[in-house]
Curated annotation (Swiss-Prot):
Subcellular location: Cytoplasm
Organism: Saccharolobus islandicus (strain Y.G.57.14 / Yellowstone #1)
Superkingdom as given in the UniProt entry: Archaea
Name of the protein in question: Pyrrolidone-carboxylate peptidase
UniProt GO MF annotations: pyroglutamyl-peptidase activity
InterPro entries, A to Z: Peptidase_C15, Peptidase_C15-like, Peptidase_C15-like_sf, PGP-I_bact-type, PGPEP1_Cys_AS, PGPEP1_Glu_AS
Subunit-level organization: Homotetramer.
Length: 209
């Protein structure tokens, strides 16, 4: 079986994206005998759905996990719910903007992850990795990706979710802005630990048919 790990390319004024670095670092690794496949998503609304759908259909992973950066957050934040809503004042990397359109015109207004995020937050904190539950993935590309990931994972009775991470310390230092950050090594360890925990507890969370 496979674990599919999505990260994002840089976007807007952020010239580096820790989610890309994490996905690349964990690509090809093995977690509980499952191979991790890291895939980098473009920050473009019109491209990510086909890419996510295609990869999940081809690989049929036991777990699909998206990660993205949330500038301003100081902790790793597993997301509970994705909403069927697109809103972006600044636009994506192709300049595309949305003002409240649905991601899926026929889809549910919101979809909960089937990953035990509450317990995951406790686990990360117990292992010295600052974490907090998030009830909003926003309305930009991360929420968009999360909605599609969970929707598609349900089709294959597999696990799907999303985790936000802070900016990485080395980049925050280079741009010389007083913004929360975390070391890249800590975030890589946190995501790896998250996948181990999710896979260990996978049977009780596979509830969709």
């Amino acid at each position: 079986m496979t674990v599919l790990l999505f990260g994002f390319e840089p976007f807007l004024e952020y010239k580096e994206n820790p989610s890309q670095l994490i996905a690349e670092a964990l690509n090809g690794s093995t977690i509980l005998k499952e191979e991790v496949k890291g895939v980098i998503l473009p920050v473009e609304y019109e491209k990510i759905e086909d890419l996510i759908v295609t990869k999940i259909r081809e690989m049929k992973p036991i777990l699909t996990l998206g990660i993205g950066v949330a500038p301003g957050r100081a902790k790793i934040t597993p997301e509970k719910i994705a909403i069927n809503y697109k809103y972006s004042r600044e636009g994506d990397n192709a300049g595309k903007k949305y003002k409240g359109e649905k991601i899926d015109p026929l889809g549910q207004d919101g979809i909960f992850t089937n990953i035990p995020v509450e317990d995951l937050v406790d686990l990360l904190n117990e292992n010295g990795i600052p974490a907090e539950l998030s009830l909003s993935a926003g309305s930009y590309l991360c929420n968009n990706a999360m909605y599609i990931i969970i929707r598609e994972a349900r089709k294959y009775n597999s696990l799907g979710g999303f985790i936000h991470v802070p900016l990485h310390e080395s980049y925050a230092a280079r741009i010389q802005r007083p913004i929360p950050s975390m070391s890249l090594d800590t975030m890589i360890r946190g995501i790896r630990l998250s996948m181990e925990f999710i896979l260990t507890n996978k049977k009780e969370n596979l509830t969709f048919s």
